[in-house]
């Protein structure tokens, strides 16, 4: 009887557009499609290294709830637009860039003054609209990081210096926008109970979907190599206990789910501000929310399912220390 496990012999990459690809791998032993697909998806969404704006200083602005004369957007929307700029740094971990523009017109990411080792992937991204006499002067700090780091976590980190006008941003470093996977049937000779793993990956353009798969696989291999090197349980028994790690996805605000305005407002009315708050609610609890009907509930369930989450989940140590409410 053959005891060795099958390894994929076919790996195909199909481009579905700019920074969007479908990766097909087969054959796998039955069950391994879901085992590896889910592991890769979670690593791709939470653990990839990328770059993001982390701090912003705007001339004439003290806090994010301000407005600027001659600028169509208020500061909150201006910050959201700045977070949409995709940066890529070469051989450095952080940089501060400048955005200056005067006069009527559209301000785009291409107007940012860049250092020689800093690149903007989406220069056509719109940041603001200036009217006649309008002026914008912004300092943007861009850093290298991993996953998603809320601004309140960074704000209470090691750097406690208070600088008037400095606005700390929630930083989504991940170069991966969306990931989904499906497991289909595969056949090898007379065996028809095998798996074919199909992964659909969209990135920001900082890395290609193929490179994203490679990096996520390396992360998994590196983590699992610890188990392969086990020689006994004595060391593990002496290791200090750690509090359970919280998935960075759960620290994201519910606004990142891109729900309809009606659904988002209903959740906020119930003090549900983070995805971690939402997944702990049951369907019955949400249906008791004023103005939230079955249609909105189905929308919430579908959006959560696309990220591998469901309602009614249990979380330990929630909310984490330092999380704003």
Curated annotation (Swiss-Prot):
SUPFAM superfamilies: C-terminal domain of RNA polymerase alpha subunit (SSF47789), Insert subdomain of RNA polymerase alpha subunit (SSF56553), RBP11-like subunits of RNA polymerase (SSF55257). Residues 246-325 are annotated as: Alpha C-terminal domain (alpha-CTD). It holds the Pfam family RNA_pol_L. Gene3D superfamilies: 5' to 3' exonuclease, C-terminal subdomain (1.10.150.20), DNA-directed RNA polymerase, insert domain (2.170.120.12), RNA polymerase, RBP11-like subunit (3.30.1360.10). Keywords: DNA-directed RNA polymerase, Nucleotidyltransferase, Transcription, Transferase. It catalyses: RNA(n) + a ribonucleoside 5'-triphosphate = RNA(n+1) + diphosphate. The keyword Transferase applies. Residues 1-231 are annotated as: Alpha N-terminal domain (alpha-NTD). GO terms for molecular function: DNA binding; DNA-directed RNA polymerase activity; protein dimerization activity. Its EC number is 2.7.7.6. NCBIfam families: PRK05182.1-2 (NF003513), PRK05182.2-5 (NF003519), rpoA (TIGR02027). Belongs to the RNA polymerase alpha chain family. The N-terminal domain is essential for RNAP assembly and basal transcription, whereas the C-terminal domain is involved in interaction with transcriptional regulators and with upstream promoter elements. This is DNA-directed RNA polymerase subunit alpha. It comes from Burkholderia multivorans (strain ATCC 17616 / 249). The lineage of its organism: Bacteria, Pseudomonadati, Pseudomonadota, Betaproteobacteria, Burkholderiales.
């Amino acid at each position: 009887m053959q005891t060795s496990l099958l390894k994929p012999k076919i790996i195909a990459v199909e481009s579905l557009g700019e920074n969007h690809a479908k990766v097909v791998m087969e054959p796998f032993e039955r069950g391994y499609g879901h085992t590896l697909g889910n592991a890769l998806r979670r690593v791709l969404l939470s653990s990839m290294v990328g770059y993001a704006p982390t701090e912003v200083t705007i001339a004439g602005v003290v806090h994010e709830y301000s407005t600027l004369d001659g600028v169509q957007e208020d500061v909150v929307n201006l910050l959201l637009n700045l977070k949409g700029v995709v940066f890529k740094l070469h051989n450095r971990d952080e940089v501060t860039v400048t955005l200056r523009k005067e006069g009527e017109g559209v301000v785009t990411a291409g107007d940012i003054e860049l250092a020689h080792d800093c690149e903007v992937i989406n220069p056509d991204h719109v940041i603001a609209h200036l009217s006649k006499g309008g002026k914008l002067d912004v300092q943007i700090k861009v850093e290298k990081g991993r996953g998603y780091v809320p601004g309140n976590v960074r704000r209470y980190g090691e750097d406690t210096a208070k600088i008037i006008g400095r606005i700390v941003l929630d930083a989504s470093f991940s170069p991966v926008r969306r990931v989904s996977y499906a497991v289909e049937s595969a056949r090898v000779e007379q065996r028809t109970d095998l798996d074919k793993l199909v992964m659909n990956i969209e990135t920001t353009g900082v890395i290609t979907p193929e490179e994203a798969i490679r990096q996520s696989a390396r992360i998994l291999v590196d983590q699992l190599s610890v188990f392969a090197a086990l020689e006994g349980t004595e060391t593990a028994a002496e290791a200090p206990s750690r509090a359970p790690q919280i998935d960075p996805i759960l620290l994201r605000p519910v606004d990142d789910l891109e729900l309809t305005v009606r659904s988002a407002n209903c959740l906020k009315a119930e003090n549900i501000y983070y995805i971690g708050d939402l997944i702990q609610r049951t369907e019955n609890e949400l249906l008791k929310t004023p103005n939230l009907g079955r249609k909105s509930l189905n929308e919430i369930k579908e959006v959560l399912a696309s990220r591998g989450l469901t309602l009614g989940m249990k979380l330990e140590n929630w909310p984490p220390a330092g999380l704003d409410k």
